[in-house]
Regions:
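C-terminal secondary-structure termini that scaffold catalytic or DNA-interacting sites
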Residues: 166-167
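Conserved recognition-core residues within compact binding domains
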Residues: 1-76, 83-151, 155-163
Length: 169
């Protein structure tokens, strides 16, 4: 029989994070969490102040196992392998929001709660352009990729044309 290492979650009396990526609550129940639209595992419970809130399994595991050298700077927990279901401590690290966004599986996609779909967007010259709403991350990501590819081809052709105009004249 193998034993699972558990560590208390700081600030959450009676809560323990486990090496297998799960959490144990004060009633000794093992909590894996249910998946949100992006695959992150979450659960709903009372916080230490007695208010109900949505809690993220990966944050509990990171608080217990992954030292945060700069808590005021590194405010987000990143899944190194980009798999939001892999909440094992060796797959988690504390990052800034900007660094965490760089490691996203699906860039240029975000979940829109109001429309219950993924919003596809690109930023061009500092301006954000909405490309539409999609039911899956894959579809959203493909649209963003195609748009960027067309934009890259357009810019490439502009550069070539400008070069030819300068060398022909």
């Amino acid at each position: 029989m193998s034993t699972v290492v558990e560590v208390p979650v700081p600030g959450w009396n009676g809560w323990y994070a486990r090496m297998d990526g799960s959490v144990r609550d004060p009633n000794n129940r093992i909590i894996w969490g249910s998946s949100n639209k992006l695959g992150h595992k979450c659960f709903y419970t009372k916080n230490p102040f007695g208010q109900y809130e949505t809690c993220w399994v990966h944050r509990f595991v990171a608080m217990a196992f992954c030292p945060n050298p700069l808590p005021d700077v590194f405010t987000e927990v990143d899944h190194i392998d980009r798999d939001p279901t892999n909440n094992k401590p060796e797959n988690l690290r504390w990052l800034t929001r900007a660094l965490n966004q760089l490691n996203k599986k699906c860039k240029n996609c975000e979940w829109c709660r109001r429309k219950k779909r993924f919003r596809c967007f690109v930023t061009i010259s500092g301006k954000r352009r909405n490309l539409g709403y999609f039911f899956t991350q894959e579809e959203c990501s493909a649209v963003a990729f195609d748009f960027k590819l067309r934009e890259l081809e357009r810019i490439y052709m502009e550069i070539l044309n400008a070069h030819h105009e300068n060398t022909d004249g």
